[in-house]
C-alpha cells in the first residue's frame, strides 16, 4: 500500500482556514498510514488527532481472541477523528470539527484494493467505552458475516426465547425476535436474523468485558428492554467457551449485593 503521492487537501468552507479540519479521501488515509498487526493478527492504524491513548488502543485490539481475529483476514481498522459522509463520498477529517461532526458517522466499511477498511470515528464518542464498543460491534458482525452463528449459542439463545426471557441485546435482535415469534410466514427467516444479531451482540459485549469493567446498566438503551442479567450471563459464558480469552486477559461475571 506504500508509495508517494500528491494529496488533494480540502478545507471545510464556512470556517477560517486556520480553524478548519483537513479532510482526505479514505484511500489517501490508507496510503499514508501503514497498519500495525497485533499478536492476534488484526491490522489497524490511527490517523489524525485521536485522543485515545496508544496503549489503550493496542490493548483494545489485543483483547480480541485469536479464534475471532482469524476470521478477520483482509480487513483493517482505521481509528480516525471523524468519518464524514458527503453524499456519495466519504472523507476523513484530521481532527474534530464541529461543522463536519453534523454529517459524521460512527463508522464506514469501504473496500479499498483487495481489503475491507473500516474507518471508526473516535471523536464522536471520545471515551474508551464507546470507542471500544463501536469497534467490537463491528468485529462481532464481521465474524457472523464470515463464519456464521455457532450452533451451541443458537440453541441457548432460542431456548431462552422459548422461555420468554425479558429483553434483548440490541434493537435489531429485539425486532427480529418479535417477528420470529409471531408465527408468520417468514418466521424462520426472522429467526435466523435474530440468531445472527444476538450472536454478534453477545460477542461484542464479551469483548468489551475483556477490555473494560462493564456494568450491566451501562448497556441499557431507551429503544428496547435490555436482556435480563441471568440470561445475559448465560450467553456471555457460552461465548467465553467458544472463544477463550487471550493470555493476559480475564473473563469474570460478578454480582453486586443491593442495599
Label every model-predicted segment.
Residues 118-136, 188-191:
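Short pre-active-site segment immediately N-terminal to the catalytic Zn-binding motif
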Residues 2-34, 186-259:
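Pan-zinc metallopeptidase signature
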Residues 140-148, 204:
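Active-site-flanking alpha-helical
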Residues 70-80, 149-150, 173-174, 252-254:
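Short glycine-rich, low-complexity/disordered patches
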Residues 129-133, 145-181, 216-224:
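Post-HEXXH active-site segment of zinc metalloproteases
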Residues 37-128:
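Auxiliary, metal-adjacent structural segments of Zn-dependent hydrolase domains
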Amino acid at each position: 500500500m506504500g508509495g508517494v503521492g500528491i494529496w488533494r487537501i480540502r478545507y471545510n468552507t464556512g470556517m477560517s482556514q486556520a480553524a478548519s479540519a483537513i479532510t482526505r479521501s479514505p484511500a489517501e488515509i490508507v496510503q499514508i498510514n501503514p497498519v500495525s498487526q497485533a499478536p492476534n493478527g488484526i491490522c489497524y492504524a490511527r490517523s489524525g488527532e485521536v485522543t485515545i491513548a496508544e496503549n489503550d488502543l493496542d490493548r483494545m485490539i489485543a483483547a480480541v481472541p485469536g479464534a475471532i481475529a482469524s476470521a478477520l483476514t483482509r480487513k483493517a481498522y482505521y481509528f480516525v477523528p471523524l468519518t464524514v459522509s458527503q453524499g456519495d463520498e466519504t472523507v476523513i477529517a484530521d481532527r474534530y470539527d464541529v461543522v463536519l461532526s453534523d454529517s459524521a458517522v460512527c463508522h464506514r466499511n469501504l473496500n479499498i484494493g483487495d481489503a475491507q477498511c473500516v474507518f471508526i470515528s473516535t471523536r464522536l464518542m471520545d471515551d474508551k467505552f464507546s470507542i471500544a464498543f463501536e469497534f467490537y460491534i463491528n468485529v462481532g458482525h464481521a465474524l457472523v458475516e464470515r463464519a456464521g452463528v455457532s450452533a451451541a449459542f443458537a440453541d441457548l439463545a432460542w431456548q431462552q426465547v422459548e422461555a420468554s426471557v425479558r429483553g434483548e441485546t440490541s434493537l435489531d435482535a429485539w425486532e427480529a425476535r418479535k417477528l420470529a415469534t409471531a408465527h408468520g410466514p417468514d418466521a424462520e427467516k426472522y429467526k435466523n436474523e435474530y440468531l445472527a444479531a444476538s450472536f454478534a451482540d453477545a460477542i461484542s459485549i464479551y469483548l468489551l468485558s475483556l477490555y473494560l469493567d462493564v456494568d450491566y446498566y451501562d448497556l441499557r438503551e431507551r429503544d428496547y428492554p435490555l436482556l435480563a442479567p441471568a440470561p445475559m450471563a448465560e450467553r456471555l459464558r457460552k461465548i467465553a467457551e467458544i472463544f477463550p480469552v487471550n493470555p493476559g486477559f480475564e473473563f469474570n461475571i460478578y454480582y453486586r449485593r443491593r442495599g
